[in-house]
Amino acid sequence: MSIFPTKILLATDGSREAELAGQTAADIAQKTDSELHVVHVLASPLATHDPSSFEPEVWARLEQRERTTLEDVVGKIEASGGAVEGSHHTAGRPDAEIVVLAEEIGAGLIVMGARGMGRIRRALTGSVSDSVVRHAHCPVLVVRE
């Protein structure tokens, strides 16, 4: 039995920190022969609104922009020689959606970036990475710049 995960979930928002996490996840997946899955979540509060409350063109542009972010991340990983087994786009609270998807696909590791929020802001609002670390069923690797 290997101590390495068979499935890795990379959570991305397209940020610089997430790009570094993507490079890390791709390296780990390649070196451990693990499947790599990538998720991008259309974050609240937009995701909690009924899409019909937006002009159809506005909602379509939002969704397309978010899908493009996911496609760009997958493209960069594949261009650097990595392989992506699955790409997932969803909407909702990013922390909750990441944890749920990790469980659904049986991920053995979640990899994500962390933004450098100050202590006061983090105390007031929390962070996606903090919440995922607390609630995930598997180890979480938080990559910092």
Where are these regions (language model features)?
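Solvent-exposed polar/charged
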Residues: 30, 103-104, 134
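Glycine-rich, Arg-bearing micro-motifs that act as flexible, cationic patches
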Residues: 109-131
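Structural beta-alpha unit
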Residues: 1-4, 75-110
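Short secondary-structure boundary segments
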Residues: 40, 113-115, 144-145
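A short acidic, glycine-rich active-site loop
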Residues: 55-68
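Small/aliphatic-rich secondary-structure junction motif
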Residues: 2-53, 86
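Short, hinge-like loop/turn segments at secondary-structure boundaries
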Residues: 53-57, 103-105, 128-129
